């Protein structure tokens, strides 16, 4: 019940009532690979180790996303393949879903591309980015930015958001 994304929205006395305060960390690829293999077993689909790792690497460090991607890859394997998930069907499926090799989706790349192409890499304000990409500022800040910052594609400065050298290299 006390799981709140923005703890600062709670008063100090209310925060103090929660006995344990936890901070969730992203999972590393090897742990996620094990989760993907286990979930494949639950879904009764066979998966190669390299395919499980590929799903893990593109899942943004999050088991929920890894499982969602696995289900979509399984669907591709059932329709386009023979029901078995190998590295080729995994890459085809994830490419069709617009999930690139670094786990960025279409909106992640659109945000970075907009900052680079329209605003010369920044700095640019959150509301300006939101208007330019057609997404709510809160969604960008809470859904997309944390991963982009964690992975080193984006940085937040007092003057606004800036694309990093990694973002330029990633988008070519």
Please provide the spans of the model-predicted regions.
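Conserved C-terminal "switch" segment of AAA+ ATPases
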Residues: 9-15, 21-89, 97-104
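Non-catalytic, well-ordered alpha-helical scaffold segments
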Residues: 53, 64-67, 71, 88-91, ...
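Terminal-proximal interaction/regulatory segments of ATP-powered molecular machines
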Residues: 115-172
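Conserved alpha/beta core segments of nucleic-acid transaction machinery
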Residues: 75-123, 127, 131-134
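Short, small-residue-biased leader/transition segments that mark boundaries at the very start
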Residues: 1-5
């Amino acid at each position: 019940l006390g799981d709140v994304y923005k703890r600062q929205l709670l008063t100090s006395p209310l925060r103090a009532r929660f006995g344990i305060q936890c901070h969730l960390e992203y999972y590393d690829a090897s742990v996620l690979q094990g989760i993907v293999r286990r979930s494949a077993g639950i879904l009764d689909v066979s998966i190669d180790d390299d395919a499980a790792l590929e799903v893990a690497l593109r899942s943004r460090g999050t088991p929920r996303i890894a499982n969602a991607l696995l289900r979509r890859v399984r669907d591709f394997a059932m329709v386009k393949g023979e029901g078995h998930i190998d590295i080729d069907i995994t890459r085809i499926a994830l490419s069709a879903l617009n999930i690139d090799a670094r786990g960025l989706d279409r909106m992640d790349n659109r945000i970075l591309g907009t900052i680079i192409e329209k605003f010369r890499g920044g700095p640019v304000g959150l509301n300006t980015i939101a208007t330019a990409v057609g997404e709510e500022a809160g969604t960008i800040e809470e859904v997309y930015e944390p991963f982009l910052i964690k992975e080193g594609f984006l940085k937040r400065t007092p003057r606004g958001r800036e694309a990093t050298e990694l973002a330029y290299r990633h988008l070519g």
